[in-house]
Amino acid sequence: NCWSSVVASGITIGFGGSVGAEAPIVLTGSAIGSNLGQIFRMDKKTMMLLVGCGASAAIAGVFKAPIAGLVFTLEVLMVDLSMASLLPILISCVTATCFTYIFDGDSSLFEFTLTNPWELDRTPACILLGVFCGLVSLYFMRTMSVCEGFFGKLSQYPYAKLLFGGLILSTLIFFFPSLYGEGYSAVNILLKGSNEAEWGQVMNRSLFSGQDNLLIFYIAFVTFTKVFATSATNGSGGCGGTFAPSLFIGGFAGFLFARLWNIYQVGVYVPEQNFALMGMAGLITGVMHAPLTGIFLIAELT
């Protein structure tokens, strides 16, 4: 587990698998912590702490987000909230982040410039966005469970499972190239764009390329088909997690909500870029049941 998941996820994403590398990296970090605990014959409590340190360091390193890594471990892995637990986890997060900065530079995963500051009259839209993200996260989790059950029934037919999953994934990517791999480049287009011509670049290399009038339909289809691409990837034998798909769907869902809000003039104007970012935090919160992780992760990713 110290290396197999990293290699498998790299191959999966490299060949277009619509998943993220974060979950395998967390598994690797946890496995390293567990192995260290066994090597030095630590007691069970210390070994669990080392597992948490490995998981948090993995999140902090891959996202360059030390606070999010710390909060993720506290919220998701439910490590004891005491100084004896917090200090080792914080040290591992900061060390992993510094290591990544040294070897990978200080660039952010997502490029975002705040051009429309927060205004109080956008509060109703933000509340409704939260409700929308909650519904989308519920759809994501339920659909994932159904698809996993379907592919589980094909476990006795590995070649049929591989062929069927590959057929679903390749068909979806053919129509919606944004589903290829992690999809972070597509999210960056939505975050950096300021008009339909710039946002329309998300449809490049697709059958809808150059048809900006179909942007809203493209965004909607991608939002609700990403879960099938992710399920087909993992169900057919790929290795990846739902962290990146949650960020991807959240960005597209937030943009879709804001775009529809502005098109139909439901209320005051809301900036699509801001709501795409808030949608990412909303989906992470809904899927992982970790609100603080969503807040700090998005703050540190941009």
Predicted regions and their residues:
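Alpha-helical transmembrane segments and immediately membrane-proximal extracytoplasmic
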Residues: N1-T302
